[in-house]
Design a protein with these regions (language model features):
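Charge-dense, helix-prone N-terminal extensions
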Residues: 2-149
Length: 149
């Protein structure tokens, strides 16, 4: 006969998100700020600070930004643009920021994609982040037509 866990221990174990490949949190899909904050809280180590910083920068730069978690990643969009302009995802050594219409940004983000319009920015623990450039990309991306899921 299997041993049962006490209810408090079982509830605590169930509440802790699973980390997928590369340390990406497995968070149930959902709309709004709550699932995005759950994702950020579950990001491992230094990546959690990056997630908080990205979220705050996006909220500050794009008033009224729309948020959701889809495919275990936070997505950001603007209602009038009809879709998503940005998402991010944890990998082992970096946090990847995806600009869905990245090839339309002035001064392209460095990461290329197999997808025609997508560009990436990889944020690594020991590399400086150009805050002014990131803010400019977020602002520009939010004004472009959104990517539809």
């Amino acid at each position: 006969m299997a041993k049962r866990m006490p209810a408090k221990v079982a509830k605590k174990a169930a509440a802790k998100p699973t980390l997928l490949s590369g340390g990406n949190p497995q968070i149930a899909k959902g709309d709004g700020d709550a699932p995005v904050q759950a994702y950020i809280a579950a990001m491992p180590d230094w990546k959690r600070d990056v997630g908080r910083h990205l979220d705050a920068l996006i909220v500050r730069t794009v008033p009224g930004v729309r948020k959701a978690v889809k495919w275990n990643s936070p997505f950001y969009g603007v209602e009038d643009q009809g879709g998503w302009f940005l998402a991010f995802h944890c990998f082992t050594k970096y946090v990847k920021v995806t600009f869905f219409r990245g090839t339309s940004l002035r001064s392209l983000p460095s990461g290329e994609s197999k997808l025609k319009e997508v560009r990436y920015l990889d944020i690594r623990e020991d590399e400086p982040l150009d805050e002014a450039q990131l803010t400019a990309w977020v602002k520009q991306a939010s004004l472009l037509p959104g990517w539809r899921t």
